[in-house]
Amino acid sequence: MAEIVFQGASALALDAKGRLAVPARHRDVLGALAQGRLTLTKHPVGCLLVFPRPAWEGFRDKVAALPLRAEGWKRIFLGNAMDVEIDASSRVLVSPELRQAAGLVKDVMLLGMGSHFELWDVQRYQAHEAEVMQQGLPESLGDFSF
């Protein structure tokens, strides 16, 4: 079976209870791949990481195996992880703690990042993207052909 790759951006809105409607193009894959089970946690750049449960388990195991000097990062990734399920209306509840950590209020952007997603506040994402673009290409992409 080919590796599942999530890609693309979806502009979405959180409802008053902090729920996010999963885009239709991802629902079937997430249902088949993870039975609608996801894990959300903090990302160091100020967004949230959203993993289908099988991808989370691999990530979690890598983080748990980090040396003691990375204990703080273990706390950030594992200590803030929340298991959620896609409900019958195709929504996911983002906890108040994680919404606050990522500055999520209403308008959000869900970005497919391969095996997982990033969930951003729209304005925070636009500022982050502008900053990245202003920095230019990193040296590691010097030989990359577009």
Swiss-Prot record:
It is found in: Cytoplasm, Nucleoid. PROSITE patterns: SPOVT_ABRB. It comes from the Bacteria. GO terms for cellular component: cytoplasm; nucleoid. GO terms for biological process: negative regulation of DNA-templated transcription initiation. Disulfide bonds: none annotated. It holds the Pfam family MraZ. GO terms for molecular function: DNA-binding transcription factor activity; transcription cis-regulatory region binding. The keyword Cytoplasm applies. Residues 9-55, 81-124 form the SpoVT-AbrB domain. Keywords: Cytoplasm, DNA-binding, Repeat, Transcription, Transcription regulation. Belongs to the MraZ family. Forms oligomers. PANTHER family: TRANSCRIPTIONAL REGULATOR MRAZ. This is Transcriptional regulator MraZ. The lineage of its organism: Bacteria, Pseudomonadati, Pseudomonadota, Betaproteobacteria, Burkholderiales.
